[in-house]
Amino acid sequence: MNKPVNLIPPVTKSVRVARSQADAFRLYTESYGKWWPLKTHSIGGEKAVNAVMEPRKGGRIFEEWSDGTVHPYGEVLVWEPPHRVVHSWYVGHPPHEASEVELRFTAVSPRETRVELEHRNWETMSGDKAGEVRERYNNGWNTVFIDKFGSFAGKVEE
């Protein structure tokens, strides 16, 4: 099966954190609900009580609501601790329009890690909305990834 041709540039972000590579990977994947900003970036708004990434290939990424229901964000496609995780992403879109998010964790030193995010495959979205959605995520990942995850993991200013 052929991979989609990336005609729309991916969103890329990078943050350095004062954590070992293994710790940075673990904080991103296993502590997802501790740093994800549900109040501003969720499907359910006030109803959202947790965000979860099941730490394994095939694991679900989802939001839990106060009534116990689960609302999917995506699925873990590649699980390579502590180096890389790739997952589908279809928040607010049908699963067949999923984009893809890759996180790479590179040790800068034993106590510092560069975490790089690439959000790609916008072409899976139908109609003309892909470019607009990409721009929203370009801004959104600044808050979610750089600010929230970065602060949670001990962001190091470059």
What residue spans do the PLM features occupy?
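Conserved strand-loop elements at the edges of beta-sheets that form or border functional pockets
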Residues: 17-19, 55, 78
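Short beta-edge strand/loop motif at the mouth of beta-sheet-based domains
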Residues: 31-71, 82, 158
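A structural signal for short, well-ordered beta-strand segments
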Residues: 13-17, 76, 103, 117-119, ...
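Hydrophobic-ligand binding "helix-grip"
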Residues: 52, 62-112, 120-123
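Hydrophobic ligand-binding cavity/cleft-lining segments
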Residues: 1-48
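A conserved amphipathic terminal alpha-helix motif
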Residues: 121-158
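Residue-level preference for beta-strand/loop junctions
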Residues: 7-9, 57, 68, 97
